[in-house]
């Protein structure tokens, strides 16, 4: 027996609501991870010659390697923070990213469910229609 489209839609809605509830109860990630004192001592501020080195971030000078490095602002990645991280730009926090991904997956799943139900219905109609010679 194939469940009706309404039953499948209610089932999908129940799963969606359960996942949303679980996401609300989860703890969010730390905004700034702690940095050990030993790590901080390996960096200095960049010299004036490197003020424009990072496109979307803060320049830090690596003492051991004697070269600049970038600490990217939120939403940017790359060696010089030159690439936008589109998911981070659309959804700034980790929780919003998870909810955005969940909404996209739910919409795709519902579209697949609707298409499947329509195809099943069409097959049933063809099966029950009488072929006139």
Swiss-Prot record:
Q: Where are the transmembrane segments?
A: 98-120
Instruction: Respond yes or no to whether keyword Membrane is given for this record.
Output: yes
Residue intervals on the Extracellular side: 24-97
Leader peptide range in chain numbering: 1-23
Residues assigned to the Cytoplasmic compartment are 121-133
Which GO MF terms are attached to this record?
epidermal growth factor receptor binding; growth factor activity
Query: Can you name a GO cellular component term?
Result: plasma membrane
InterPro entries, per the entry: EGF-like_dom
Reported tissue expression: Skin.
A biological-process GO annotation: epidermal growth factor receptor signaling pathway
Taken from the UniProt record, the cysteine pairs bridged by disulfide bonds within this chain are: 46-59, 54-70, 72-81
The record's section on PROSITE patterns has: EGF_1, EGF_2, EGF_3
Which ranges of residues are annotated as propeptide in this record? 24-38, 89-133
Q: Keywords in alphabetical order, please.
A: Cell membrane, Disulfide bond, EGF-like domain, Glycoprotein, Growth factor, Membrane, Mitogen, Secreted, Signal, Transmembrane, Transmembrane helix
At the top level, the lineage of the source is: Eukaryota
Q: Which residues does the UniProt record annotate as the domain EGF-like? A: 42-82
Q: Which residues are glycosylated?
A: 25
Please describe the quaternary structure of this protein.
Interacts with the PDZ domains of MAGI3, SDCBP and SNTA1. The interaction with SDCBP, is required for the targeting to the cell surface. In the endoplasmic reticulum, in its immature form (i.e. with a prosegment and lacking full N-glycosylation), interacts with CNIH. In the Golgi apparatus, may form a complex with CNIH and GORASP2. Interacts (via cytoplasmic C-terminal domain) with NKD2.
**So what does this one do?**
TGF alpha is a mitogenic polypeptide that is able to bind to the EGF receptor/EGFR and to act synergistically with TGF beta to promote anchorage-independent cell proliferation in soft agar.
Q: Which PANTHER family match?
A: PROTRANSFORMING GROWTH FACTOR ALPHA (PTHR10740:SF1), TRANSFORMING GROWTH FACTOR ALPHA (PTHR10740)
Name of the protein described by the UniProt record? Protransforming growth factor alpha
Could you tell me which species this protein originates from? Ovis aries (Sheep)
